[in-house]
């Protein structure tokens, strides 16, 4: 909720990411340049720094870690083997899962006597324990299975908001919680006796600090005291809840900014000093219980700290990854609902003797919505499959990209539906009106899209900077590196016609050869744009926010293209129903994505004097100086 665009994005990059990295036997570079050896050196260095972490039996059964897929797009490297869409749920387990979901689908699809779904009903349906281990009376589902099992309840956005934040708390406890914390909380979380929820955001955060909510440690008692309030907390009044609270803390004997940190606490709603505040009258999701929560002198033990004290940013990666993936599922379900409602409306509506479905504009709108939903779903389950298939796989960027793409597209679909339906959509209670409100709520609650875009670009640039360091230094010092500059002059690679050597078409169905070529060209253009930005701006690249937003969109489009092609190729090869139309969908996504990537990268190459950024920045100074619109009336005389 902080207005500063860097508030969430840059903060998450301040902690070190330690994890085992297995350098692949052979990755494929998009363009031929001098970055190959640099990339290998960076990978070796990062692998050398990896710490040995004790792994669970579940992790040990997975395949070795691969290099990050989306991060490598920024340096022109692709992992062609990941074009094989993951199949992490065996056939027999998939059949059992589909059968177990039938009661859930029937409950949420069929009309109910009462619109309200009580927590007791959700307990009986077993929806609280989907991602809890079977050791604690849960279902024991992995990422892909738990997301698939969450689809029925995600059709009711007011119900699923509480369930998804509950599952985020479970995910964090499974990954970074101590054995004592897992034994204490997971069984109650699985059965619904205890309902987890995040308490992170504040309406008015401080200008300099992380949070107004603070926690102070009293070493002589071994206790923490928590004070403050959180907003936009999804509550279940009358039920026992477990709040996941991020609070600002100060390291002992380290004064000032150096000792400032964040700590993650687990706070039981029945503890003294915890009080539910008023319900927020939000723009969308109006039936959900979204409230303020007040913490007034709450005493917490050291066993209620998740991870290490003062080091909450270190565990933010696991927290936001889970939150983004499960939030993307909510957006995906809403987008599907909007598309289905629009299709029904166009089929059943006739105007001036013509069915709406026969109008070309309506067809184009429905097809674009279909492509967006297909890409959302492909990205979500590709990311989940990577987590399920590979050990400690880095999907930080993939999860952020999935949420970024999903929320942008679901809002676009919701707003465009208004134009198709017409003035009727303005009536209160219409499905189009409710859909627009819910889409706007998802886009605004939590991370803003601008902050998420900055995070995507910063993460990609951070990864690319390690690999491109040597080459960029030479390019920025041409007098001391004439051979390097001469090689650049002889290179006939261009942003309009980049050369690629990836041969992705060999790893997908032959019908997708053109789509694979679109991905190759887009990855090559992204790598060239990143290298140019480093060469032009150096360390000041983080200040070029408009260019970074373009980079974020390019990386997002490439991942959407990649996931769609991988999914469509699998569908056609195994003969799924309507797989030929999936090929058409993936081809349309890649064709449009290629053109958009070329436009964005050309704008980056042109610079701020060519792409109009300079004019807009200059204009903004006068807008700020005048505190708004500054032009006089167009009919004014000057005499």
Curated annotation (Swiss-Prot):
CDD domains: ACAD. Its main location: mitochondrion. Residues 1-26 form a transit peptide. Coiled coil: none annotated. Residues 23-65 are annotated as: Disordered. The keyword Transit peptide applies. It comes from the Eukaryota. Residues 48-65 have a biased composition (Basic and acidic residues). It is an enzyme of class 1 (oxidoreductase). Disruption phenotype: Late larval lethal at third instar; larvae die before pupation. Larvae have delayed development and an almost 4-fold prolonged lifespan, develop subcuticular melanotic masses, have small eye and wing imaginal discs, and have malformed fat bodies. Its EC number is 1.3.8.-. GO terms for biological process: compound eye morphogenesis; fatty acid beta-oxidation; lipid homeostasis; medium-chain fatty acid catabolic process; mitochondrial respiratory chain complex I assembly; negative regulation of cellular response to oxidative stress; response to endoplasmic reticulum stress; sexual reproduction. GO terms for cellular component: cytoplasm; mitochondrial matrix; mitochondrion. SUPFAM superfamilies: Acyl-CoA dehydrogenase C-terminal domain-like, Acyl-CoA dehydrogenase NM domain-like. Disulfide bonds: none annotated. Keywords: FAD, Flavoprotein, Mitochondrion, Oxidoreductase, Transit peptide. InterPro entries: ACAD9/ACADV-like_C, Acyl-CoA_Oxase/DH_mid-dom, Acyl-CoA_Oxase/DH_mid-dom_sf, AcylCo_DH-like_C, AcylCo_DH/oxidase_C, AcylCoA_DH/ox_N, AcylCoA_DH/ox_N_sf, AcylCoA_DH/oxidase_NM_dom_sf. Gene3D superfamilies: Acyl-CoA dehydrogenase/oxidase, N-terminal domain, Butyryl-CoA Dehydrogenase, subunit A, domain 2, Butyryl-CoA Dehydrogenase, subunit A, domain 3. One of its GO terms (molecular function) is flavin adenine dinucleotide binding. Its cofactor is FAD. Belongs to the acyl-CoA dehydrogenase family. This is Complex I assembly factor Egm, mitochondrial. The lineage of its organism: Eukaryota, Metazoa, Ecdysozoa, Arthropoda, Hexapoda.
